[in-house]
Design a protein with these regions (language model features):
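Secretory/organelle targeting and membrane-embedding segments
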Residues: 1-212
Length: 212
């Protein structure tokens, strides 16, 4: 869902059907998921949980490298990660901007020293948007530092009106609004592209609870 919303083209209308059509185009353009592009993990102690088999191979963490075979996104990697018992609960979308082939700044200015510019969406209940970029350090000379600008709905007059994630989904389900849901066609497309992974999943790697 997150991948589709980030990669989809503008819909013809701000309506569930039009948005779902564009999301399904993204799903259909996905390359098959190769087992070599997937990491599966299981936190230590999971098999001791009530109702869990001591031989369980179920993952509690997964990281996937995806690519889209279309004109706009060909060659651009997408990385999806989700897991339980992480060091912190986060819902983040981070877009890294590709560095230009040449820079007008001097080699010793510090440009690129802290990685590429990022546009980051924090989808937690108090949603935030931040942009990291390089800016000139005050004073003579040309030295650049990594700076950041941020907007947070928690700092607006409407902070109390923000719905929690499941509140929004339940409300949309009651209203019959499937904008945030995957259609049957979308699920089928994703299932087809997951067949190589389902046929030969990589082994789970143990990791410590409350860790990265």
């Amino acid at each position: 869902q997150v991948l589709a919303f980030m990669a989809m083209k503008p819909p013809t209308a701000l309506a569930p059907q039009a948005i779902s059509e564009e999301k399904n185009k993204v799903f259909r353009s996905m390359e098959p998921i190769r087992p070599s592009d997937v990491v599966r993990g299981q936190y230590n102690g999971y098999r001791d949980e009530p109702g869990v088999s001591p031989f369980s191979d179920t993952e509690t963490f997964i990281a996937v490298h995806c690519e889209l075979d279309n004109w706009r996104w060909a060659g651009v990697p997408f990385y999806l990660r989700t897991g339980k018992q992480m060091a912190e609960g986060m819902r983040i979308i981070s877009i890294a901007f590709k560095e230009p082939p040449r820079s007008m700044f001097p080699a010793d200015s510090g440009v690129g020293s802290a990685g590429p510019d990022h546009l980051t969406f924090d989808l937690a209940d108090e949603s935030k948007v931040s942009l990291s970029y390089y800016g000139k350090r005050p004073g003579p000379g040309m030295k650049l530092d990594k700076l950041s600008m941020q907007f947070s709905t928690g700092e607006t007059d409407y902070a109390g009106d923000v719905l929690e994630a499941y509140e929004r989904l339940i409300l949309d389900a009651m209203r019959g609004d499937h904008t945030l849901f995957t259609t049957a066609d979308g699920i089928e497309s994703l299932w087809e592209r997951s067949i190589p992974l389902l046929d030969a999943p990589p082994p789970v790697t143990p990791y410590a609870p409350v860790s990265w």
